[in-house]
């Protein structure tokens, strides 16, 4: 049953690359087979509940620009928001969604009231999922917006805040389990510091490590089969976050014995804030064995802020999905649009148009990436570049060589290697042929 919020807009369909209809897909065809798999199953698109249905269009200099009929702190409004959300998922044809607890439920006066409200809306979500076939990609807890978390959640100097956060994660893991969620995400927006003058760095890291171990212990206790994911970000809102980037997260996981239990959810915009490319973070996560899922968006390259815009750069998407394919594709993860409208885009149709453009961009990137994989456009030159390491001598040097034995061989065989071109320009031109 229609809520009426989207007027007379009907289900978004694939019309092909020649279509000029803004409410149609030009490149995303869910049933198109790419490398032996349906496009929908490769991309596993999800809609972010928070940016799509909760964000009011504020900025540091101005208030709400979006007028939504569910912008009230009541259970009735929460259920209307859910009605509109699931109608949106069906119009768009996205198979998944993601949410924080605070996105979905009214804010209560106590932990018990929050839990009661969450349980009620989770039951409502469960019925919506049964009615529509839409599934939960991942759930998470908002432990950064409420003022109690201004000094962190797991890293807060107040043990009562740590306890409140731990209890909140328990309820959110329970909710994710009940809804059949395929992952559970932790993003530490306040797990960091503003100044070292009032921060015990080691204690906060130790507390965060213990907190995450508790999450993993509870996951196994309740039989949750999904992945636990950390989402790296270098700063914003904290001056310095402890989950700065993939490399930092991996070091943290190794320190606290969690590298086999926890993976990463990598966001395009966060990678850029950390001074990396998206594909760098994806490639590193794959190399370290912790690749899990992605949040798709883009930043404004001039402002330096985490602007969470919809992706529209096909070459960037091609290189990103190339790394996803190199990792074997998604297992429990997917492509969550952690993207929001610009505050001047106030029409309901804008919500659909933003996602349509992002989905088309990702589809084009996936197809280009798949063709590069099939043609060995990059893997062939890469194999040639490292071919010397396939020789018996090179393998023996790594396996049993010492500095003394290697030095003796270099001198005895008069080894004098000459540089070989890295062919970066050629490879960049190759990529451009596919995008």
Swiss-Prot record:
Catalytic activity of the protein: alpha-D-xylose = alpha-D-xylulofuranose
Cofactor info, note text: Binds 2 magnesium ions per subunit.
Biological process annotations from GO: D-xylose metabolic process
Xref: Gene3D superfamilies: Divalent-metal-dependent TIM barrel enzymes
Sites where the protein binds Mg(2+): 306, 308
Subcellular location: Cytoplasm
Example GO molecular function: xylose isomerase activity
Cofactor needs: Mg(2+)
Entry keyword set: Carbohydrate metabolism, Cytoplasm, Isomerase, Magnesium, Metal-binding, Xylose metabolism
Major subcellular site: cytoplasm
Domain of life, per lineage: Bacteria
EC number: 5.3.1.5
GO CC, one annotated term: cytoplasm
Quaternary assembly: Homotetramer.
NCBIfam families in UniProt: PRK05474.1 (NF003998), xylose_isom_A (TIGR02630)
Entries under HAMAP family matching the protein: Xylose_isom_A (MF_00455)
PANTHER family: PTHR48408, XYLOSE ISOMERASE
Name of the protein: Xylose isomerase
């Amino acid at each position: 049953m229609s809520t009426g919020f989207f007027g007379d807009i009907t289900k978004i369909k694939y019309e092909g690359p020649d279509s000029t209809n803004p409410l149609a897909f030009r490149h995303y065809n869910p049933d198109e087979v790419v490398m032996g798999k349906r496009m929908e199953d490769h991309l596993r698109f999800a809609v972010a509940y928070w940016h799509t249905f909760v964000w009011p269009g504020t900025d540091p200099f101005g208030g709400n620009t979006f007028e939504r009929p569910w912008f009230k702190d009541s259970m009735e409004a929460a259920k209307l928001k859910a009605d509109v959300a699931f109608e949106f998922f069906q119009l768009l044809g996205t198979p998944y969604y993601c949410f924080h607890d605070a996105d979905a439920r009214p804010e209560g006066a106590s932990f018990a009231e929050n839990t009661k409200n969450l349980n009620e809306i989770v039951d409502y979500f469960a019925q919506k999922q049964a009615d529509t076939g839409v599934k939960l990609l991942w759930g998470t807890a908002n432990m950064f917006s409420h003022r109690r978390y201004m000094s962190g959640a797991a890293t807060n100097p107040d043990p009562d805040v740590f306890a409140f956060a731990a209890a909140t994660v328990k309820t959110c893991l329970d909710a994710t389990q009940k809804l059949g969620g395929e992952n559970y995400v932790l993003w530490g927006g306040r797990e960091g510091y503003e100044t070292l003058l009032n921060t015990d760095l080691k204690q906060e890291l130790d507390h965060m490590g213990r907190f995450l171990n508790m999450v993993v212990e509870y996951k196994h206790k309740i039989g949750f089969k999904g992945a636990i994911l950390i989402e790296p970000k270098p700063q914003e809102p904290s001056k310095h976050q402890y989950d700065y980037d993939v490399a930092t997260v991996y070091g943290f996981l190794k320190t606290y014995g969690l590298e086999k239990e926890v993976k990463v959810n990598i966001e395009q915009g966060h990678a850029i804030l950390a001074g990396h490319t998206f594909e760098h973070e994806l490639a590193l996560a794959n190399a370290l064995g912790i690749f899990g899922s992605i949040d798709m968006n883009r930043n404004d390259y001039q402002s330096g802020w985490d602007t969470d815009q919809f992706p529209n750069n096909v070459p960037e998407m091609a290189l990103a999905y190339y790394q996803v394919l190199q990792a074997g594709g998604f297992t429990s993860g997917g492509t969550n649009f952690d993207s929001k409208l610009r505050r001047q885009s106030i029409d309901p149709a804008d919500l659909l148009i933003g996602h349509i453009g992002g989905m088309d961009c990702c589809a084009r990137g996936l197809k280009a990436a798949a063709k590069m994989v099939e043609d060995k456009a990059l893997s062939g030159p890469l194999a040639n570049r490292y071919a010397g390491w396939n020789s018996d001598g090179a393998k023996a040097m790594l396996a049993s060589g010492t500095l003394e034995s290697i030095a003796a061989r270099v001198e005895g065989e008069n080894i004098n290697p000459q540089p070989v071109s890295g062919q970066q320009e050629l490879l960049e031109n190759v990529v451009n042929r596919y995008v």
